């Protein structure tokens, strides 16, 4: 079986990225990921959610990109069943999962900047459906092992996705939180897209709270689209 048999990807993205899927680097990603899936190890997110960010935000609908690093590797209990927190969107978690510290800080800053009520749920699917691509640079992870799938090669794929998206004529708003994400600035054509940077929202990082990052995002969105982005959840 092929990757897309385990991890469905929308037709719009298959067409947008069709040339990538034939390249040796992607065939190697596919091989390594499928080997990991078939191993005794538990892989997050569920394979059916691997391409959730793409399936909720078609390439022609992308207006904002919020780049994450790799999926949450933790679990939570629901009805005595252990379930993955990760659900295929950067920073987002399953509807009934506890809200992680980084996402709590995102919600705090969003409330401080724009007055958006702090949600009781950490599922950001609504943002994705409104045109925010919630993309992790690395798309999968082994349970309880942060950055364990760096070896698979996902970053080469996510870089190509960004490069292809940056070819668009409409300015994209690219939100890069933390030093790892900010390395992607090198991929962005100068004077074409709007780059917004801030420290990572992790409590281990300093400077995110009070950065005004969402004020900057909303200002940029108004400049490009003449309306506000709806951050409500």
UniProtKB/Swiss-Prot annotation:
CDD domains: UDG-F1-like. One of its GO terms (biological process) is base-excision repair, AP site formation via deaminated base removal. Pfam families: UDG. It catalyses: Hydrolyzes single-stranded DNA or mismatched double-stranded DNA and polynucleotides, releasing free uracil. InterPro entries: UDG_fam1, Ura-DNA_Glyclase_AS, Uracil-DNA_glycosylase-like, Uracil-DNA_glycosylase-like_sf. It comes from the Bacteria. It is found in: Cytoplasm. GO terms for cellular component: cytoplasm. The active site is at 70 (proton acceptor). Its EC number is 3.2.2.27. Keywords: Cytoplasm, DNA damage, DNA repair, Hydrolase. One of its GO terms (molecular function) is uracil DNA N-glycosylase activity. SUPFAM superfamilies: Uracil-DNA glycosylase-like (SSF52141). Belongs to the uracil-DNA glycosylase (UDG) superfamily. UNG family. Excises uracil residues from the DNA which can arise as a result of misincorporation of dUMP residues by DNA polymerase or due to deamination of cytosine. This is Uracil-DNA glycosylase. It comes from Helicobacter pylori (strain J99 / ATCC 700824) (Campylobacter pylori J99).
